Every structure is written in C-alpha cells, then in structure tokens.
Amino acid sequence: MSNDLKKTPLYDRFVESNAKIVEFGGWAMPVQFSSIKEEHNAVREVMGIFDVSHMGEVLIEGKDASDFIQYILSNDTDQLTDNKAQYTALCNDKGGIIDDLITYKLDNQKYLLVVNAANTEKDYNWINSHSENFDVKVENVSDQYGQLAVQGPEARDYVGSLVDVDVSEMKPFDFKKDVTIFGKNIILSQSGYTGEDGFEIYCNSDDVVDIWDGLLENENLVPAGLGARDTLRLEAGLPLHGQDLSEDITPYEGGIAFAAKPLIEADFIGKEVLKEQKENGSAERTIGLEMLDKGIPRTGYDVLDLDGNKIGVVTSGTQSPATGKGIALAIINRDEFEMGREVLVQIRKRQVKAKIVKKNQISK
C-alpha cells in the first residue's frame, strides 16, 4: 500500500486494533476490524461505529450564499430550514452527477456541504469556479473536521445518553449545532449510510480520537469498516458515487429523482436536461436486483432479458449478509422495467437468474 495515502486522525487506532487497511479514494481506511459479516450484523442488530473523517467538507458563506447553492445544487435548497440538512447533488450542464452530498444550513448566509472523499478537491474547484458572480466565499475546510457515524437500533438511546440535548424527537436530516459530548463541541446529525437509525457526529479533527475512545467505552458498540458500510448501504439501496452515480448519470437515471428540484423559475446548472427528464422521463433507470440462483453480481456485469439480449448493467453488487443471496443495483433501459420481472445476469461465462426488486432490500 502506498505511503502517499492520506490518513484520518484515527489511523493509529486502526493499526492498534489490527484492522485490515485498504486504499479508498486516496485514503488508508479500515475495510474490516473483525469480519464484514460480524460488523454488518452488529449495525443491523445492535450498533456500530464508523470513522468517516475522510469525507470532505466545503463551507460556503456570504450575502449570496442561499442563491449560490440554489444555482449549483440539484435539490430545492429554498426548502432548507434552520437545523435541517438535505441530500442533493452537484450536476453538470448535462445533468450528470459530479457528486452526491449533504447540505447543512448553518444560518442564512452559511452552508456546509459534505462531499465524498474521493471527490473533495474536484468538488471544491468546481464550486469555486462557478462562484464569481455571487458574493460568497468558498472554502475547503475538510482538514478541520472529523466525522464519526454511530448506526443501529441502539444508537439513538446510547448517543442520547451522552449528549446535552434531547435527541428523542430528531427525524432524518435533523441536526443540532453546539452539542457537547465528552466535553467536546459537535454538530449532531440524524443521518447515515446504512439504512438504520443513527447519528453522524461532526467535530474538530483534534477531538475525534477522544470521542471515538469515549464512545467505545460501551462494549455493545462495534467498530466497523468500509466493507460492512458497503454491504449495509447496498441492502438499503443507497448509491455510491463512482459506481451507481457518475457524471454520465442524471438524478432521474440514478434513482435519486427526489434530489432533483421541482420546476422552479430560478436558473440552476443542468436545468434544461433535468426539466426535460422530469416532464418526459429518462431513457434509463436504476433498479434493485435479487439473485434467484447462486451467484454474486459485480460492477460491470451485463443484465440480460431471458432471451439473452442486453438491457442494462450492474453498477454495484454483493452477497447480502442478511439473506446470503446476491443483491445489486443496476441501471437498465426504462422500457424494460417491471417490478418482479425475471432477468439474467452475465456472471463470467454463466447467465444467472435474478429478479427486479425494490432498491431497498432490508427486511424489517
């Protein structure tokens, strides 16, 4: 593994834990601590903790901040209220997804964008290059932040017992500023990437080790790596940029149409393409797949009709720890979509039966 990889402040903790470290988006990150299945099940059944300090943070502030983010982001940022976050995307002129991200409204003139680690520099440069006609300051503040995710059925009660605010009524994408945990100031967000209840904790990068150590005083909290994070998000039908989303895929094609604006008067990047797809539909759409026969669908495998004609491609796939079955997200021709339809996945030299299912495959 290259010595040039970036490391989060928790890297030494990973080494001490004998975690398996891999390269991810230019970072040295733990793929697993014990086993992917154990960590996955801990999050589904009890709770787990992830270091996500590799994620990027871009701060936008100034008199025109609200107008600027409405211009550059796919979702309707006028719907943002204080202490509310929003899932959204940066789109290019063709509606393609440069990145998917979370926007936090800190106040009327200050917004924090949390972007994917591998895209941080690209996103920052792109955002900054479109800011010249707005009275805003765009700053890459990624080095200032640490981020932890505590996820699972017991996460709310546990985190709630440690902070100085009431979390019992927090709903998805609610957040609270100036929260204290272990004497440290944090932003507490009711969000995650697992399909479970839980929180994401944003803190000063100098505080993340102390908060990690403090949280792990509870033996029921299990450290989890990128492997479990991937199987959890795939079961939940949550896309990963670079696989399920890309600059050639629009929100309507990528299964995140809810993150595209309604038809508003204001100008925004990608408006014409997104407007046309909203009114007339896109040529392709993202689906969930469940394998009916033995086999694990992987990124790039062709999806075929029962006559062997190609109708799409797998964008992400794995074996579900919950069911033992192969599951996937795939993008197919819209005309070929029918819920429950049987299809084939070309797995090496075999054509293996699967069926179209909901993207979220968590059995609750």
From Swiss-Prot:
Gene Ontology MF term list: aminomethyltransferase activity; transaminase activity
Superkingdom of this protein's organism: Bacteria
Keywords: Aminotransferase, Transferase
EC numbers, comma separated: 2.1.2.10
Catalytic reaction(s) noted: N(6)-[(R)-S(8)-aminomethyldihydrolipoyl]-L-lysyl-[protein] + (6S)-5,6,7,8-tetrahydrofolate = N(6)-[(R)-dihydrolipoyl]-L-lysyl-[protein] + (6R)-5,10-methylene-5,6,7,8-tetrahydrofolate + NH4(+)
InterPro entries: GCS_T, GCS_T_bac, GCST_C, GCV_T_N, GcvT/YgfZ/DmdA, GcvT/YgfZ_C, TrmE/GcvT_dom1
Pfam families membership: GCV_T, GCV_T_C
GO biological process terms on file: glycine decarboxylation via glycine cleavage system
Gene Ontology CC, one term: glycine cleavage complex
Quaternary organization: The glycine cleavage system is composed of four proteins: P, T, L and H.
Recorded family membership: Belongs to the GcvT family.
Function: The glycine cleavage system catalyzes the degradation of glycine.
Protein known as: Aminomethyltransferase
Chain's gene name: gcvT
